[in-house]
């Protein structure tokens, strides 16, 4: 089950056992020394597939299967601490981060309860890597599993596809065959299917698939049923609500909700946030698993979709403890200092993208026929600094 790991809970948690296999690969350049197709080799990979699908428990803490795969088999570009600007990034395994641990459990619980997933988040927290993992992991470990990646714009879908295809290629080349799947029938820029073809042209094999489509209209969310339907950059999709409703037909059969819709949106998007805002604020109306969010204007909990504020997710070691928990008060001070450097529309944009509460993330939704800069300047005083006109005593 899920045990909270945050600034006040899970103080005895130790993350090292959960990414031990990644550490072995880093030291040796290999996951296992057993010869391919030997019994120890087969037993090793059978256990890894089990952990990637059922999760992994050490002591009283458990990570989900997706999270185990992410920590031990997913490669991503990271910035080295202390590196000079322009030095580039290095490819590494992810580190354990408590907020990601919470989100992976949220996804698993939604799937167990036949609910869907929606998240509103601050910009720059690397969630696209997790989205790619949510497509790649079941492709590798589950026969016949189908994931569909959708986005309203090609420019925003291509980076996600690139991440997925890069992972598949890395696993093909670096797991000594343990996670390698041939793609002899469908292997193009938009779709990958794990299968082989007989000399007579008959397709057979693992048959898992990752497909993608540019859903710039709601009518393009159609086709064969899928197990995970991912709406990337949902906050930029002006057809999100219609696409979400039509997408239900792809994850449901005869009233049974067997698949999962996953919508991911970022604060600060212009004009098209209404759909994501509605889904976020009224999760149960859209079959989304409700999340008790304490990061609100009055600090009273609200049932929303999942929310990750900027100050509770750091990738900088100076704001992280040994458990991967962000020291939120210190990190919030960092963002507050950055906010003090800006004003007007620039401040509004910054607060929307690096939000502390959902209201900030959604400031820019809707159309505005008035002076946006003047309004932004006043709104940022009221909304961000809580400033207002102070009453004065005067003589009549």
Model regions and ranges:
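Pre-P-loop entry segment of helicase/translocase ATPase cores
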Residues: 1-116
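Catalytic P-loop NTPase motifs of RecA-like helicase/translocase cores
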Residues: 125-126, 157, 237-240, 271
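Conserved nucleotide-state-sensing and coupling region of NTP-binding domains
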Residues: 146-216, 285-293, 393
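Conserved P-loop NTPase catalytic core
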Residues: 31, 198-201, 207-211, 225-229, ...
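Walker A/P-loop
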Residues: 112-135
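Conserved RecA-like ASCE ATPase "motif II neighborhood" in helicase/translocase motors
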Residues: 188-252
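Post-Walker A helix-loop "phosphate-sensing" segment adjacent to the P-loop in P-loop NTPases
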Residues: 138-145
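Substrate-engagement module of ASCE P-loop NTPases
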Residues: 247-259, 264
């Amino acid at each position: 089950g899920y045990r909270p790991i945050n600034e006040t809970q899970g103080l005895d948690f130790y993350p090292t056992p959960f990414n031990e296999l990644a550490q072995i690969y880093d030291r040796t350049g290999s996951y296992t020394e057993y010869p391919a197709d030997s019994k120890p080799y087969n037993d090793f990979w059978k256990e890894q597939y089990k952990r990637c699908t059922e999760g992994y428990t050490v002591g009283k803490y458990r990570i989900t299967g997706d999270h185990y795969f992410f920590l031990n088999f997913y490669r991503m570009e990271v910035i080295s601490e202390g590196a000079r600007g322009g030095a580039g990034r290095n490819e590494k395994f992810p580190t354990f981060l408590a907020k990601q641990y919470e989100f992976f459990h949220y996804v698993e619980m939604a799937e167990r309860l036949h609910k869907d997933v929606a998240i509103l988040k601050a910009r720059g927290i690397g969630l696209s890597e997790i989205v790619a993992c949510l497509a790649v992991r079941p492709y590798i470990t589950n026969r016949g599993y189908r994931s569909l990646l959708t986005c309203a714009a090609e420019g925003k879908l291509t980076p996600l596809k690139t991440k997925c295809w890069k992972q598949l290629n890395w696993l093909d080349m670096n797991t000594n065959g343990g996670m390698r799947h041939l793609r002899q029938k469908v292997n193009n820029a938009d779709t990958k299917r794990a299968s082989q073809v007989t000399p007579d042209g008959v397709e057979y094999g693992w048959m898992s698939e990752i497909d993608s489509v540019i859903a710039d209209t709601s009518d393009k969310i159609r086709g064969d049923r899928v197990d995970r339907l991912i709406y990337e950059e949902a906050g930029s999709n002006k057809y999100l609500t219609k696409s979400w409703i039509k997408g239900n037909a792809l994850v449901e059969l005869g009233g049974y909700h067997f698949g999962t819709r996953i919508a991911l949106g970022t604060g600060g998007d212009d004009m098209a946030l209404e759909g994501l805002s509605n889904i976020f604020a009224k999760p149960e109306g859209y079959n989304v698993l409700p999340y008790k969010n304490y990061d609100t204007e009055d600090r009273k909990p609200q049932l929303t979709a999942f929310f990750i504020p900027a100050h509770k997710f750091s990738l900088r070691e100076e704001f992280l403890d040994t458990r991967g928990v962000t020291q939120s008060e210190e990190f919030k001070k960092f963002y507050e200092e950055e906010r003090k450097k800006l004003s007007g529309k620039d401040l509004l944009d910054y607060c929307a993208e690096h939000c502390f509460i959902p209201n900030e993330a959604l400031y820019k939704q809707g159309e505005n026929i008035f002076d946006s800069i003047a309004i932004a300047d006043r709104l940022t005083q009221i909304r961000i600094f809580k400033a207002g006109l102070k009453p004065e005593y005067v003589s009549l």
